[in-house]
Amino acid sequence: MAEPRKSGLISHGIAAQNRKARFNYTIKDTVEAGIVLRGAEVKSLRMGRATLSEAFAGERDGEMYLFNMYIPEYQGGVLSRFDTKGPRKLLLKRKQIDQLLGAIARQGSTVVPLDVHFNPRGLAKVTLGIAEGRKQHDKRQAIAKRDWERDKARILKNR
């Protein structure tokens, strides 16, 4: 039996991660939201070419949007052009929007995207984190703890 052809596209699973978000922020809560994308944006995202490092979520006209998420143009011969860093609408219920806006207003938190993934049905979703910024000494402690965990695992492995 012949193997299925691998196209290099992501049908489900993580398409892009914001690794710096977990380092620069303390994540208090997470929310999963749908994201409105056009066809060429979805194709480019399925190729795993998105960047979330400068992205953030915010409110505009009572709706939540994702700003500064970079999705490069799809090079597959599609004529439709799109703004690579334009705002993208997030699909959330009103209760979730109120929860996010309340956390931003009350606690001085921010909403950062942690990852963009495709669920088992093939729909694009973004995981948002309600986050507080870390101080420099907290970042140093996180680095020291991570290094110690790595060294401890290495020592236990070599026993």
Curated annotation (Swiss-Prot):
**Residue span of the signal peptide, if any?**
none
Q: Which cellular compartments is it found in? A: Cytoplasm
> What are the GO cellular component annotations?
cytosol
What keywords would UniProt list here?
A: Cytoplasm, RNA-binding
MF terms per GO, please?
A: RNA binding
A UniProt-annotated Pfam family:
SmpB
Its GO biological process annotations read: trans-translation
Function description: Required for rescue of stalled ribosomes mediated by trans-translation. Binds to transfer-messenger RNA (tmRNA), required for stable association of tmRNA with ribosomes. tmRNA and SmpB together mimic tRNA shape, replacing the anticodon stem-loop with SmpB. tmRNA is encoded by the ssrA gene; the 2 termini fold to resemble tRNA(Ala) and it encodes a 'tag peptide', a short internal open reading frame. During trans-translation Ala-aminoacylated tmRNA acts like a tRNA, entering the A-site of stalled ribosomes, displacing the stalled mRNA.
Instruction: Tell me its family.
Output: Belongs to the SmpB family.
Known PANTHER family for this protein?
Answer: SSRA-BINDING PROTEIN, TMRNA-BINDING COMPONENT OF TRANS-TRANSLATION TAGGING COMPLEX
Put simply, this protein is called SsrA-binding protein
Q: Which organism is it from?
A: Acidiphilium cryptum (strain JF-5)
Per the record, the gene is: smpB
